[in-house]
């Protein structure tokens, strides 16, 4: 089964983004084999552009605005648009808009499965995902649109920081902010917000910042140079990978004029708990730099976000962005997001649930379908992770012994050999959608090469031999292996999401595979798996784990801080030898400005990571972006996920809806 489109990948980097037919593959238990190449369902051709082709920063003599905000100006509720714009707004270039300058008005209909925890993203709160976070946050740099940039120019893009400069020794980075941008309440955005973000959030161990304390390197300090300039000082040379850490979400400052008075460092009556909850989901509107402001929240029903009248971005005809007036998020489930999009009652879906793929293929063939779907390359994957922390979250001697077992690479190899990826894939959806995954970078990553992925494929006999050699034998004859020397039965809990259907199906399929090698699995479904990984109270975990870009959230995938990755928390003094190698490679990526060196180090990381089975890769699949045909300026080649999720990759502020009115001057 294939998909035909008029687009074909053209660039060398994009030619690596392949992927989709599942193969039944065997492997010997002793030899090293590499992951076999897959076949792609995507036939897209993308003309990559230069980084300066997307946007610039430029002033206009006069600005246009939507009829909605103009009515507020006329009523005396807002200053004129010229007074709301920064000195030099971010300006989108028309040549990269597939449908050209947009039209004002209309409602973007979205469906998500998340729920807003609160709006203090500085303290790590989730706003519900699915686009809410991306629409209200703005970060210093930006990664999402990099999927369309030539590989030799694919460094992080400017955003709130319009430019920057490295010192000659690369031990300091000076960044210059856009001048005169305003928060949605009209307050000026400046380095006071940067100072609060860094010193009172990132550097405060009591705040669960999205950017870990040492993500830019231990000893990194911030120096404020003026209202719109600041400098990072590092203990050792750094490179452009640092800029990637300053993109969504870690590099998103919050409104200091709102949040600073709520922080314990500035308010003796405040606690860190009260600070974290200082922007509750029940109190709206909030203050943001994003294109849209949350104004209505009905629990488990909907979220409404309306255009930010102070948004600091424009198009080349000096029309203030965004184009459409509001987004309505229906709060149901992630699977319902795709169902609604296919039915025409939702406008957008990152189709990540392979169970819906067959229906999407049918819709593609129907000229009357309200939605168009474009399948990309294999960018989503599922892994089985083992808790590698020696003591974090351990509550018994049995659990401590299990952890030591998980830290043994031979045991991890045995588990990988036990996984029948073909059966797993077909249990999720029948068809040519799946391919084995070895862990690490997905096949669609520009940093992935199949020859770098060491693969311990399905071989139950080999798995049993390895376990026998580890002394894990059924010493009491009940059909379940025991820990060495007549120890307890080998019973292992497997954490997985109870709300994502693919995760549920994979966990169910894994049960018989564990039983076939004498291990008793106990499934542990949860609607809040983060709570378990945060406190370390888990053994194994099946989840989606897609690493696409080497420089993006590197601390989430490698142990560059003591609290990451999720499968090895509290790792100070606890790293395995191969993890120390991974850390050194990661430091190399963070220290270089040479993209070819980044690619070489990424290849090394993939080899080390997969040979040592850092996580057990299960399956990987393509994703499809579903867009209602009434939505304009959605680039047809935008991936569901690469440098960032599609909501950032397609630049939602440039989306417009086919019914509304043209901008008025």
Where are these regions (language model features)?
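Charged, glycine/proline-rich intrinsically disordered loops and linkers
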Residues: 50, 257-279, 393-401
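Surface-exposed binding/hinge segments that line
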Residues: 212-271, 427, 638
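Mature extracytoplasmic/periplasmic domains
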Residues: 260-263, 432-452, 624-629
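Gram-negative bacterial Sec-dependent N-terminal signal peptides
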Residues: 2-29
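A structural "hinge/loop" feature
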Residues: 96, 112-134, 160, 188, ...
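Glycine-rich and polybasic anion-binding loops at the starts of cofactor/ligand-binding domains
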Residues: 618
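N-terminal lobe/hinge region of extracytoplasmic solute-binding protein
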Residues: 65, 71-75, 79-166, 199, ...
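Extracytoplasmic/periplasmic ligand-capture domains
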Residues: 30-59, 71, 75, 146, ...
């Amino acid at each position: 089964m294939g998909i035909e489109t008029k687009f074909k990948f053209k660039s060398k980097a994009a030619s690596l983004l392949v992927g989709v037919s599942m193969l039944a593959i065997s492997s010997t238990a002793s030899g090293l084999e590499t992951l076999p190449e897959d076949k792609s369902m995507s036939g897209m051709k993308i003309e990559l552009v230069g980084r300066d082709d997307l946007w610039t920063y430029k002033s206009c003599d006069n600005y246009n605005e939507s009829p909605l905000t103009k009515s507020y100006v006329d009523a005396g509720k807002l200053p004129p648009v010229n007074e709301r714009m920064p000195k030099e707004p971010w300006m989108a270039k028309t040549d990269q808009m597939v449908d050209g300058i947009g039209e004002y008005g209309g409602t973007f209909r979205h469906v998500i499965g998340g729920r807003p925890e609160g709006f203090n993203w500085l303290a790590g709160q989730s706003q519900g995902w699915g686009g809410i976070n991306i629409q209200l946050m703005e970060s210093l740099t930006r990664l999402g649109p990099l999927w369309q940039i030539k590989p030799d120019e694919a460094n992080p893009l400017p955003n709130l920081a319009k430019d920057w400069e490295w010192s000659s020794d690369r031990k300091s980075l000076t960044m210059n902010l856009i001048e005169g941008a305003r928060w949605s309440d009209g307050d000026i955005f400046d380095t006071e917000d940067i100072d609060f973000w860094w010193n009172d959030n990132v550097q405060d161990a009591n705040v669960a910042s999205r950017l870990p304390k040492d993500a830019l390197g231990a000893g990194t300090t911030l120096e404020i140079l003026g209202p719109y300039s600041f400098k990072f000082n590092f203990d050792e040379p750094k490179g452009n990978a640092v800029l990637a850490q300053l993109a969504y979400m870690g590099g998103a400052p919050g409104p200091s004029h709102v949040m600073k008075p709520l922080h314990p460092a500035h308010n003796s009556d405040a606690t860190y708990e009260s600070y974290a909850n200082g922007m509750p989901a029940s109190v709206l509107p909030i203050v943001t730099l994003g294109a849209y402001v949350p104004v209505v929240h009905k629990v488990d029903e909907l979220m409404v976000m309306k255009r930010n009248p102070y948004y600091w971005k424009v198009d080349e005809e000096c029309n203030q962005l965004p184009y459409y007036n509001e987004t309505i998020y229906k709060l149901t489930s992630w699977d319902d997001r795709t169902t609604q999009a296919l039915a025409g009652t939702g406008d957008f879906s990152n189709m990540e649930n392979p169970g819906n793929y067959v229906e999407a293929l049918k819709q593609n063939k129907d000229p009357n379908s309200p939605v168009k779907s474009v399948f990309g390359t294999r960018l989503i994957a599922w892994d089985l992770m083992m808790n590698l922390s020696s003591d974090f979250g351990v509550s018994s001697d049995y659990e401590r012994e299990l952890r030591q077992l998980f830290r043994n690479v031979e045991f991890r190899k045995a588990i990988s050999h036990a996984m029948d990826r073909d059966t797993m894939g077909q249990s999720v959806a029948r068809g040519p959608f799946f391919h084995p995954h070895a862990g690490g970078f997905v096949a669609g990553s520009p940093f992935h090469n199949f020859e770098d992925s060491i693969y311990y494929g399905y071989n139950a006999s080999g798995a049993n031999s390895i376990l026998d050699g580890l002394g894990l034998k059924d010493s009491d004859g009940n059909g379940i292996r025991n820990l060495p020397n007549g120890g307890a039965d080998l019973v292992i809990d497997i954490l997985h999401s109870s709300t994502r259907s693919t995760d549920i199906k994979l966990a169910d399929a894994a049960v018989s595979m564990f039983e076939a090698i004498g291990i008793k699995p106990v499934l542990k479904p949860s609607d809040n798996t983060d709570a378990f990984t945060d406190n370390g109270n888990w053994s194994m975990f099946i989840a989606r784990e897609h690493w696409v870009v080497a420089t993006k959230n590197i601390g989430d995938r490698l142990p560059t801080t003591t609290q990451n990755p999720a499968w090895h928390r509290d790792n100070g003094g606890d790293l395995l030898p191969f993890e120390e190698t991974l850390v050194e490679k990661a430091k190399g990526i963070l220290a270089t400005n040479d993209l070819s060196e980044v690619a070489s180090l990424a290849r090394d990381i993939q080899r080390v990571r997969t040979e040592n089975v850092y996580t057990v890769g299960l399956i990987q699949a393509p994703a499809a972006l579903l867009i209602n045909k009434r939505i304009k300026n959605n680039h047809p080649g935008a991936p569901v996920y690469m440098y960032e999720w599609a909501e950032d990759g397609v630049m939602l502020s440039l989306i417009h809806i086919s019914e509304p009115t043209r901008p008025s001057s």
